[in-house]
């Protein structure tokens, strides 16, 4: 299954969670903040399977990953001696596109993915254009000099502070430590995702 590229506001309403992490989907003045569809404003009780599937889909949308990518990440997390769900989130947070977003070079993960895809960043002097690339702690990512005047980057840097596990200086950032569970998404129930794949 491919990565979802459609409108995210509708998906955010479906999940009752800001996929873009801006809460614009639920801001005052928006006509519809409930789930889409004819009966969107009615609560639907999900089955046990439905709850697990629901959480998995939410994780895919938040991080912008495909089913194949999420399953691969889960299998890698299972091999760890640490808590599988926490490691799963840490691996997703360690993706290059996510770190570009966390460092404040983009206002959304989609925007960050686009910047990476277009080759605006380098690692050790080499082009880094694979969004799913797993970045090791201690790695420094640099925005190319020719990309530093991009309006969307300049606006993002003014608006977005870097996350606690990323240090940003000028046009580069360093992924200096893995985030703790308490620092990551509080609205994601990663245990349900782990249980979904474990069945």
Curated annotation (Swiss-Prot):
GO terms for molecular function: rRNA binding; structural constituent of ribosome. Residues 94-157 form the S4 RNA-binding domain. Pfam families: Ribosomal_S4 (PF00163), S4 (PF01479). It comes from the Bacteria. One of its GO terms (cellular component) is small ribosomal subunit. PROSITE patterns: RIBOSOMAL_S4, S4. CDD domains: S4 (cd00165). One of its GO terms (biological process) is translation. Keywords: Ribonucleoprotein, Ribosomal protein, RNA-binding, rRNA-binding. Belongs to the universal ribosomal protein uS4 family. One of the primary rRNA binding proteins, it binds directly to 16S rRNA where it nucleates assembly of the body of the 30S subunit. NCBIfam families: PRK05327.1, rpsD_bact. Part of the 30S ribosomal subunit. Contacts protein S5. The interaction surface between S4 and S5 is involved in control of translational fidelity. This is Small ribosomal subunit protein uS4.
């Amino acid at each position: 299954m491919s990565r979802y590229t459609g409108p995210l506001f509708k998906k955010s309403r479906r999940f009752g969670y800001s996929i873009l992490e801006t809460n614009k989907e639920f801001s005052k003045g928006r006509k519809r903040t409930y789930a889409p569809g004819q009966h969107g404003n009615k609560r639907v009780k999900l089955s046990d399977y439905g709850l697990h599937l629901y959480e998995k889909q939410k994780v895919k949308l938040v991080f912008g990953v495909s089913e194949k990518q999420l399953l691969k990440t889960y299998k890698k997390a299972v091999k760890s001696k640490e808590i599988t769900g926490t490691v799963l989130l840490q691996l997703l947070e360690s993706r290059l596109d996510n770190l570009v977003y966390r460092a404040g070079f983009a206002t959304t993960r989609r925007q960050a993915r686009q910047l990476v895809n277009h080759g605006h960043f380098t690692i050790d002097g080499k082009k880094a254009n694979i969004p799913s690339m797993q970045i090791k702690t201690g790695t420094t990512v640099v925005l190319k000099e020719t990309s530093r005047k991009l309006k969307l980057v300049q606006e993002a840097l003014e608006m977005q502070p870097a996350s606690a596990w990323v240090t940003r200086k000028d046009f580069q950032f360093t992924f200096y430590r893995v985030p703790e569970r308490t620092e990551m998404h509080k609205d994601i129930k990663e245990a349900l995702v782990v249980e979904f794949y474990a069945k």
